[in-house]
Amino acid sequence: MVKKMTRLIIFDLDGTLLDTIDDLAAACNHALTACGCPTRERDEYFMLVGRGIDNLFRGALPEDRRSSAMVDRMRSFFLPYYNEHSCDLTRPYEGITEMLDRLEAAGIRFAVASNKYQAGTEALIDRFFGKYGFVSILGQREGKPIKPDPQIVIEAMEGVPEISKEEVVYCGDSDVDMLTGINAGVRTIGVTWGFRTRDELLAHNPWLLAENPGEICEAILQDMK
């Protein structure tokens, strides 16, 4: 791992900062039932989430019912349910708040770049991480491309123009996140506690593969010495 000073960490949200899988699965199964479709098992959702809610719906729906109209119908049931129940079982992963505390105390800036819809992203950050001064909280928005398109990371970096690209790292739990960082030209951190596998992350040669949040702290703070 090459030493480089880090001043901004851009985080993915689901599977990286927060364990959201149970609430996402419950909301999607609620929508499937409302649409007259069979539900999915919880573990199936680990591979379905992470590419925006429309792709979540397409993946969860039976193959013969993946029309645009059905995706719209799924959204109409999913959003009200998830907005009400998004914090029922969702929690920060162990060690996340301690990591953020240590990094913030060292002067590291934070941003979030997620494929979760914007209102949902903002609500969860406010609920669980409201005390931290995120420079940007960015989710999926109408007319904006989703990850792995790098635009969302570039937009987050534009919020702190005094920080160079070489001082930025993007942190996530999936191949989509690793590709997003690569496409944006920044270093990547893959986290093994999220929704995807170590092998999926290692295939994209992350700057750091972290087994726990403490390892992120150690790597970032060591490079400041």
Name what the model sees in each region:
Residues 2-9, 43, 104, 118, ...:
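Asp-based, Mg2+/Mn2+-dependent phosphohydrolase catalytic module
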